[in-house]
Amino acid sequence: MTAIDLNADLGEGCDNDEALLALVSSANIACGWHAGDVNTMRQTTAWALRQGVSIGAHPSFPDRENFGRTEMHLPPDEVYAGVLFQIGGLSAIVRAQGGRLAHVKPHGALYNQAARDRPLAMAIARAVRDFDASLAVFGLAGGELVLAARELGLAAKEEVFADRGYNADGTLVKRGTPGALLENEEAALSQTLAMVREQRVQSVDGVWVPIRAQTVCLHGDGAHALAFARRIRDRLGSEGIAVRAGA
């Protein structure tokens, strides 16, 4: 049977977190630098452990004002220290509740820049390796972060997005531009199935692009996020695709 990991970014102030955890297999928990705080980290961790969901850290640039979406050009050593700090904080909270971290997925601008900026990607990968080399790294499919993680001997999962538009080079269409978000649920469902079953995605230009899908991100924000997540989960099941972490 084909299997895929479904992940969601949580602990960011949305009301859907507990319900989404019943639908996904991996949770990326905000570490306080773009959203969340120690209380949301503890609560989201407790919910994830209760559901048996794999837990990951979701570090970002220090940018609460713009939800971690502001591009920053910081020295690699500063990024290394910041990522290490955020992973360590969440790991302590998870361990105190009897769990353990399984992966790290950067957030927002840090994620997108690391997909194309090798020094930044290496700084993130080094932080993960130096904290715990057994942790996996989630990065944009085909991006520099995936390559950097593997170069350092880490497990890397190539991530795709159910509801984001793609450019012909496999990168995500920038937020705020036409085609960045797939508003039509059927289109997003079709895109997800194509990525998981056929390992390809159709770009906004109509070009089919090869893509490796090892984990699919479902966004938890938005009025219809929970209903859409249920549809994705149901459709995968009806197609004989199992949902599990480590798939």
From Swiss-Prot:
Superkingdom of the source species: Bacteria
CDD domains: LamB_YcsF_YbgL_like
EC number: 3.5.2.9
Chain's role: Catalyzes the cleavage of 5-oxoproline to form L-glutamate coupled to the hydrolysis of ATP to ADP and inorganic phosphate.
Listed GO biological process terms: carbohydrate metabolic process
Membership in a protein family: Belongs to the LamB/PxpA family.
Species per Swiss-Prot/TrEMBL record: Ralstonia nicotianae (strain ATCC BAA-1114 / GMI1000) (Ralstonia solanacearum)
Chemical reaction(s) catalysed: 5-oxo-L-proline + ATP + 2 H2O = L-glutamate + ADP + phosphate + H(+)
InterPro entries: Glyco_hydro/deAcase_b/a-brl (IPR011330), LamB/YcsF/PxpA-like (IPR005501)
NCBIfam families assigned: PRK05406.1-1 (NF003812), PRK05406.1-3 (NF003814), PRK05406.1-4 (NF003815), PRK05406.1-5 (NF003816)
Enzyme class: hydrolase
Subunit structure: Forms a complex composed of PxpA, PxpB and PxpC.
Stated name of the protein: 5-oxoprolinase subunit A 1
Keyword tags: ATP-binding, Hydrolase, Nucleotide-binding
Parts forming coiled coils: none
SUPFAM superfamilies on file: Glycoside hydrolase/deacetylase
GO molecular function, one term: 5-oxoprolinase (ATP-hydrolyzing) activity
